[in-house]
Each structure stands twice: as structure tokens, then as C-alpha cells.
């Protein structure tokens, strides 16, 4: 009999029925037994609506208990869950529908009209999509229905299709199976003792993102944790929740931790309960790491991408102080290398591409074998990320290969410049992009969100002091509004560059 990704929930419903499974927005609590019953009722609802094992079901909506219940209910009957990113445009949503071919899409009220408009366009061949409200699952709470019969599933049957953000091409549907999901959970169960039954985890990012369903729904429920979901991220509320609920585990992007650290109440907040705090999605600025370290909280840099299950390596606790930028050396079963274009291993401190091999790496892309063959070569997934391995084998990520700026024959990593500029106290966000240059081919340009006290001269003066001359931004643009982000929450480097055509005309020249 194949172990299913929902078996963990059912186990804890028997083993610890009264243990809190989920606390939503600080008030709405449900225990494991109640959640198991609710998701069985959801599975029967799906069947009555026409969903069958192997069918795809799209889900779009803000964080909610109904989102969780609808997803687990679909998995219990053997359907494939396809999270639709809340921030995708109408055209992007239409692409997801056409590519994934769902039989059904569930939407909350906030996203229903946009999705309905996307579905109103001429459908793909033989495509008939039913649109249902996520709110329909609210009334199923408390129902006592018969458990959903186990589907006839194999270990390599697909359970989820999670789409990438589409930074350089159309979003790709990353596949997860029962086997790959359990491999990821087991890998980190060996490595991280904080991921233990009854531990208290908080999640403030979108459930529709790459880490949502796998890392912050299925993973904690399989391990018997108690999860505190927030409707969204609000710095003061999240900081208060960390302290009041004695949260032990949290993961987020650098911006979350930076915004909380800037709060006046941060200094007095009791965060002593935190045991495992991971920061991912981008390189964390060292000043942010230090601000939390001053409170005794180790921010541990993680590395991963959708194709790697969200996280494939995590800086060990004993390295978080001495090597704050390290992403670690891999996990128990997952290996990482840094290689040259010819596939040979780089020497220590030599930049190269990070490649990954492990049991949790995606087994493929949905309907895109060519892209998978290009990425997965000789058993190693080629990430497209530039990394550097030190003499002890610890890796630090430098940048995306495609983001590296080649100026006058020299390679420049935008993240290196961004790390320096981020040290200026007036800087809220910074993105370094390439700008065309007649002499050097391309040069670095910095687009900064900062308060009015910051000047381009201050930026370039610091960069001249800290960086080689060819790394100093030749253009500096300062704005008072946040930088544009992708649906995943990462800074949208390409969109920011395209939004500033003046960069080609020396908007803020630097000698």
C-alpha cells in the first residue's frame, strides 16, 4: 500500500486528536481530529462536484482555513492540486488554466471575478472547467462524514503542480509526487530537531507560493506540528504573535525580517522561544541578520527553488554567526556542487553554477520534457544560480547566472553591490540591474527605494570605498515607493529594468 501525503494528518488525528493543528489569524483554532473530519467532508464535496482521481484542481485565494481544507480534501481522493498564484495577472491565470487543464478551479471572493474573466476567453481544446467558490467549504466544518476511501495511488503519482514565477519565460509546472514529498520531509526530519511534534510554527506568506502547500501545510501536518497561519504579513502583528504565542519556527523572505527589525517595539520583544528561523527567497543582507542576532535569534540562510521542493540546503546553527551568508553544505540526502560550464568542480572561492542531486528534486515539469531535460543532466539539477564554495565546503549564493553583469569583460554580481548599498540606513530596498554602455557593453545601475535624505552621491561614495571601480553603479535612481515584486514576492529585476528606460541615457552618471 502506497503511503499518501495526507496520511500524516490522519495519523495525528488518531494519535493526538485534541492537539491544535491550525490557528488562523490568532483566533480560529482547529485540532487534528476536527481537521481530519473537515478534509474528509471536503473530499466528498469534490467527488460530488465531479472531481476524480488524477484530475487537476486549481485553487486561488487569500490564506484561509478553507484553502487548506480544499487542498487536502482533493489530495485525499487522489486529485492533483494546482495552486494559482494570487498575484498573477488575468493572462497569466489563463495560461495556468490552459497548461494544467484543471477540471475544477476554486476561488475566493477576492479573486473570483478575475479568474472568471480569464476563463471567459475561448478555452483550450476539449477543456471544460468548473468554477466553484472556496467559501463552499466553510459549511462543511463540523460534518461527520465517512472517511474518503483511499485512492489506488502509486508512490510516483503526481500530487501537486506548483508553477514557477516565470522570471525569464512562461511559468513551468513543477511536479511533486507522494515519494518526492516524503523524501523532502524525511530529509529535514533528520537534520532539524526543531521540526518535532507539537512544535509551534508560523506562516505569513501566501499559501499559493512555492513553499505554501508542501512546506507549510503538508510538511508540518505530517510531523504533527501546530501551525499559526496569518491572513497576510503585517510587521507589528507578526512580531506580537511571535512573542505572545511563543512561536518556535518561522520562515520568510529577507524583507519580512527587515521590516520587523525596524519596529520600535522590536528591541523589547521577547523572541526567546524561536528555535528555527530560516530566511530564503533572496540573499539576506548581513545587517538584517545581525539585528536579529543581537536579540539572540539566529537567522539561518536557506537555499532552494520550486524545483528543489522549496529548500534544499540550510546554514547549520553553528555556522550562522561566523558564516551568516552561507547556505550550508546540503542536507542528509541532498548534495550540492559548484561547477564550471564544462561540468568540472570549481576550486574553493571560484564562482560557478550550483547543481543539486537528491531524492526530493522534482521528477519533472508538467508537459515540458524539453525544459526538464535541459535542467536535469546526469542526475544533477542545474539551478542557474551562481555560487561559491569555500575551503570547508560551505556554499554562499552569489546571483542568478542570467543576472550577472558583464562590464568590460569583468563579471559583476548584482547581489554584491546590493549588499553594500543596503548598509546605508536610509535604504529600504535596492535592486541592481544592467544598463547598456557604449564603452563597456553594460554597466551596473542601482534602483533604490529610500527616504528623501539619501543622495546618489552618498551611494556611490560608499560603493567606491567598498568595491572595485568597475562594480560601482554608473546610474543611481532613488524613489520613494517600493520596488516591484514578482508573484513569488521576490524583487522583479527584469520589470524594474524595463520600467526605467532612462538608464540607457545616464540618468545619474557616475564617473
Model-derived segments and spans:
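Conserved pre-ATP/AMP-binding loop-to-beta segment of ANL
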Residues: 2, 17-18, 145-163, 169-170, ...
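Conserved AMP-binding/adenylate-forming core of the ANL superfamily
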Residues: 10, 18-64, 68, 72, ...
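Conserved AMP-binding A3 loop
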Residues: 31-34, 159-186
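Structural core segment of the AMP-binding/adenylate-forming
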Residues: 48-49, 76-141, 450-454, 479
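AMP-binding/adenylate-forming catalytic core of the ANL superfamily
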Residues: 88, 105, 242, 250, ...
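Conserved AMP-binding/adenylation subdomain of ANL enzymes
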Residues: 182-200, 208-249, 263
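Gly/Ser/Thr-rich phosphate-binding loop
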Residues: 222, 247-252, 261-322, 335
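AMP-binding/adenylate-forming catalytic domain of the ANL superfamily
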Residues: 468-490, 508-510
Amino acid at each position: 500500500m502506497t503511503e499518501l501525503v495526507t496520511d500524516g494528518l490522519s495519523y495525528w488525528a488518531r494519535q493526538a486528536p485534541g492537539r491544535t493543528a491550525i490557528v488562523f489569524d490568532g483566533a480560529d483554532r482547529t485540532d487534528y481530529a476536527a481537521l481530519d473530519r473537515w478534509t474528509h467532508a471536503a473530499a466528498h464535496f469534490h467527488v460530488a462536484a465531479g472531481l476524480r482521481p488524477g484530475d487537476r484542481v486549481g485553487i486561488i485565494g487569500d490564506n484561509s482555513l478553507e484553502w487548506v481544507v480544499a487542498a487536502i480534501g482533493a489530495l485525499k481522493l487522489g486529485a492533483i492540486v494546482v495552486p494559482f498564484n494570487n498575484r498573477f495577472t488575468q493572462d497569466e491565470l489563463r495560461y495556468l488554466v490552459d497548461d494544467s487543464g484543471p477540471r475544477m478551479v476554486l476561488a475566493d471572493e477576492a479573486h473570483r471575478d478575475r479568474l472568471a474573466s480569464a476563463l471567459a476567453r475561448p478555452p483550450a481544446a476539449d477543456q471544460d472547467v468548473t468554477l466553484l467558490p472556496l467559501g463552499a467549504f466553510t459549511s462543511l466544518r463540523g460534518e461527520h462524514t465517512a472517511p474518503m476511501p483511499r485512492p489506488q495511488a502509486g508512490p510516483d503519482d503526481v500530487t501537486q503542480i506548483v508553477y514557477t514565477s516565470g522570471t525569464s519565460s512562461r511559468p513551468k509546472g513543477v511536479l511533486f509526487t507522494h515519494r518526492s514529498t516524503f523524501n523532502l520531509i524525511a530529509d529535514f526530519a533528520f537534520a532539524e530537531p526543531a521540526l518535532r511534534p507539537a512544535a509551534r510554527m508560523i506562516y505569513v506568506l501566501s499559501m499559493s507560493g512555492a513553499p505554501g502547500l508542501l512546506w507549510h501545510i503538508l510538511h508540518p501536518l505530517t510531523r504533527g506540528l501546530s501551525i499559526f497561519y496569518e491572513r497576510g504579513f503585517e510587521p507589528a502583528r507578526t512580531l506580537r504573535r511571535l512573542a505572545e504565542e511563543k512561536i518556535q519556527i518561522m520562515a520568510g523572505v529577507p524583507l519580512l525580517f527587515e521590516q520587523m527589525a525596524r519596529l520600535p517595539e522590536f528591541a523589547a520583544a521577547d523572541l526567546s522561544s524561536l528555535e528555527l528561523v530560516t530566511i530564503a527567497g533572496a540573499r539576506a543582507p548581513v545587517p538584517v541578520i545581525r539585528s536579529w542576532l543581537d536579540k539572540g535569534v539566529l537567522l539561518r540562510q536557506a537555499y532552494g527553488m520550486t524545483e528543489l521542493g522549496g529548500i534544499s540546503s540550510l546554514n547549520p546553527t553553528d555556522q550562522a554567526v561566523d558564516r551568516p551568508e552561507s547556505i550550508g553544505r546540503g542536507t542528509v540526502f541532498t548534495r550540492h556542487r559548484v561547477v564550471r560550464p564544462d561540468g568540472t568542480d570549481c576550486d574553493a572561492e571560484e564562482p560557478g553554477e550550483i547543481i543539486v542531486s537528491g531524492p526530493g528534486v522534482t521528477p519533472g515539469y508538467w508537459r515540458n520534457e524539453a525544459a526538464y531535460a535541459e535542467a536535469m543532466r546526469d542526475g544533477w539539477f542545474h539551478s542557474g544560480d551562481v555560487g561559491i564554495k569555500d575551503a570547508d565546503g560551505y556554499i554562499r549564493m552569489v546571483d542568478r547566472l542570467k543576472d550577472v553583469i558583464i562590464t568590460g569583460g569583468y563579471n559583476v554580481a548584482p547581489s554584491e553591490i546590493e549588499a553594500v548599498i543596503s548598509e546605508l540606513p536610509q535604504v529600504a530596498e535596492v535592486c541592481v540591474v544592467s544598463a547598456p554602455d557604449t564603452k563597456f557593453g553594460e554597466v551596473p545601475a542601482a534602483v533604490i527605494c529610500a527616504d528623501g535624505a539619501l543622495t546618489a552621491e552618498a551611494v556611490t561614495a560608499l560603493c567606491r570605498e567598498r568595491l572595485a571601480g568597475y562594480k560601482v553603479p554608473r546610474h543611481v535612481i532613488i524613489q520613494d515607493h517600493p520596488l516591484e515584486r514578482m508573484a513569488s514576492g521576490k524583487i522583479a529585476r527584469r520589470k524594474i529594468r524595463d520600467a526605467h528606460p532612462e538608464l540607457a541615457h545616464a540618468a545619474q552618471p557616475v564617473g
